[in-house]
């Protein structure tokens, strides 16, 4: 709710934050199914896809990407834009930052991320970690909307953001990558100067896109 409030203040837009089913009780694809239901609800209410910006942080960043990919797979209109804060895009955990930033990130650990991905995939799943359904970094990203990606230099998931921005650019998706010095996972929720700067940047990005 902290980030939802900050998004509303920085963008001047209405913000809908929804609860979705969580792992391990509700593993993949429960979360994406719930997100699609919310998308369908917004469309049913007469809110056009081009009037919606989908935002998410951490696992929510993964969900935001997977929602856009699911909408694309259904042949439907994309949201106006994506705003991703420290998104989790690569469940293979092979990015360089998983080792280089292990001692720097005060929020996440390698073991914690491993336990989260195992819970999210589900005990009976046969999906590989590089499957785009789990790791949107490896998806066909063409046709996705303009995307703002924010990440801190000190976070384990830094590679997820850097590699996503690179993949999007290579696939002709407009992507803006912002890397904030000495910041950690989802630093935007904290009362620090870099968080204020990041939220101001989100506001500028949204107003430019709209």
List the model feature ranges, each with a label.
Residues 1-210:
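Alpha/beta-hydrolase superfamily serine-hydrolase fold, recognizing
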